[in-house]
């Protein structure tokens, strides 16, 4: 279990009495701390977002290996319930807990013939997006965001 997942466990999951089971590192996405686990019986994918030098927000990948060398976005039919994305800076720390339906509604997951995304930007409340798509993304994403900056 990586350090960010361990910190989330101690700050959030333990505090709410949640049971974390079956955590294992995913072979794909290790540079984003990719893990799969269950929390209170829900199937959860976990990622750590990364700061990029030239754009506001943080980037996270969320894809699966298809066949051979091909990768593809997760599909609404895939068996999972949540995606948790930790985001942090030297002064701030928080996480997004996206339910599957929100990822589907906002084009992250493949639905039918509409292909989802292999990665996307997250915009915690301390970021100020400087374009319309960033503002729109932050607007829906903040519904699933918890700021823990005062606890670190």
What are these regions, as identified by a protein language model?
Residues 1-23:
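Acidic-basic catalytic patches of nuclease active cores, encompassing PD-(D/E)XK
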Residues 104-151:
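Helix-rich interaction surfaces within compact, conserved domain-sized segments
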Residues 72-79, 85-89, 111-113:
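Short, charge-rich binding segments
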Residues 44, 94-96:
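Short beta-strand segments
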Residues 20-78:
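Short, well-structured hydrophobic secondary-structure segments
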Residues 32-34, 79-83, 92-93, 117-119:
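Short, surface-exposed beta-edge/turn micro-motifs
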